[in-house]
């Protein structure tokens, strides 16, 4: 854990998943105060939203400094996103690859919408720094996770709201193994164990089966990425 490099408040996109939990720790190590926002858009794995409370309790237990920095946790319902999307994340259909090379778990515009709503909330609360877990190093190919997309959106929302926002993506160039390592660097074994036990990644919302990397079906693309990253992390660290 390090001293904050900023006396400002950050807003973290916090879904209850591995990546967003790691980003929350990253923000807590760098900002004086941190607020969170999560989105309920009719996702099949909405159980991840329920994981946030236990994760936050765990963060407070790991560090009294982190506990003192944790601010409001917001939840925003966006049912319209599910209504206009026809994907395996919002419909009870089998996960498969599409003809365009993208898995049918891709929700068009999801991160663009999330970040725009986050910026609108940040504007109202006087926050300029927004943190998201987007990554194009070890991911499913979603175009709204790419670095150039995030940079373009940062410019657009800054212009559109006449406010200089900064979109931080600390995982952008890290693979999943490096994301596990970052969690360890930030909060030690306690944070790694917290993320394993209480974060949620599985697209199917499965929490009945426990693996060494956490809970999930073990078969969907999200579980596969998380499991592979865990194995590589354990190999690298011995």
From Swiss-Prot:
Keyword Acetylation set for record: no
Binding site for ATP: 14-24
GO biological process, one term: queuosine biosynthetic process
Catalytic activity annotation: 7-carboxy-7-deazaguanine + NH4(+) + ATP = 7-cyano-7-deazaguanine + ADP + phosphate + H2O + H(+)
Annotated CDD domains: QueC-like
Cofactor binding annotation: Binds 1 zinc ion per subunit.
Pathway(s) the chain acts in: Purine metabolism; 7-cyano-7-deazaguanine biosynthesis
Pfam family name, one: QueC
UniProt keyword terms in alphabetical order: ATP-binding, Ligase, Metal-binding, Nucleotide-binding, Queuosine biosynthesis, Zinc
Range of residues in the leader sequence: none
Coiled-coil stretches: none
Cofactor: Zn(2+)
Keyword Transmembrane included in the entry's annotation: no
Gene Ontology molecular function terms on file: ATP binding; ligase activity, forming carbon-nitrogen bonds; zinc ion binding
Similarity field: Belongs to the QueC family.
Protein name per the record: 7-cyano-7-deazaguanine synthase 1
Gene (UniProt): queC1
């Amino acid at each position: 854990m390090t001293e904050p490099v900023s006396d400002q408040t950050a807003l973290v996109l916090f879904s209850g998943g591995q990546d967003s939990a790691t980003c929350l720790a990253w923000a807590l190590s760098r900002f004086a105060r941190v607020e969170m926002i999560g989105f309920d858009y009719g996702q099949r794995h909405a159980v991840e939203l329920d994981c946030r409370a236990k994760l936050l309790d765990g963060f407070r237990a790991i560090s009294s400094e982190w506990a003192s920095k944790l601010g409001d946790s917001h939840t925003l319902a966006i049912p319209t996103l599910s209504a206009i999307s026809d994907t395996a994340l919002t419909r009870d259909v089998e996960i498969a690859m599409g003809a365009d090379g993208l898995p049918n778990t891709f929700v068009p515009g999801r991160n663009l919408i999330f970040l725009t709503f986050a910026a609108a909330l940040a504007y109202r609360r006087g926050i300029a720094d927004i943190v998201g877990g987007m990554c194009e190093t070890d991911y499913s190919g979603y175009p709204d996770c790419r670095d150039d997309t995030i940079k373009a959106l940062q410019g657009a929302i800054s212009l559109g709201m006449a406010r200089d926002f900064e979109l931080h993506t600390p995982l952008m160039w890290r693979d999943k193994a490096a994301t596990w390592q970052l969690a360890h660097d930030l909060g030690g074994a306690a944070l790694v164990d917290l993320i394993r036990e209480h974060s949620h990644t599985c697209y199917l919302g499965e929490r009945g089966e426990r693996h060494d990397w956490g809970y999930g079906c073990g078969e969907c693309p999200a579980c596969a990425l998380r499991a592979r990253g865990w194995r590589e992390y354990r190999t690298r660290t011995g």
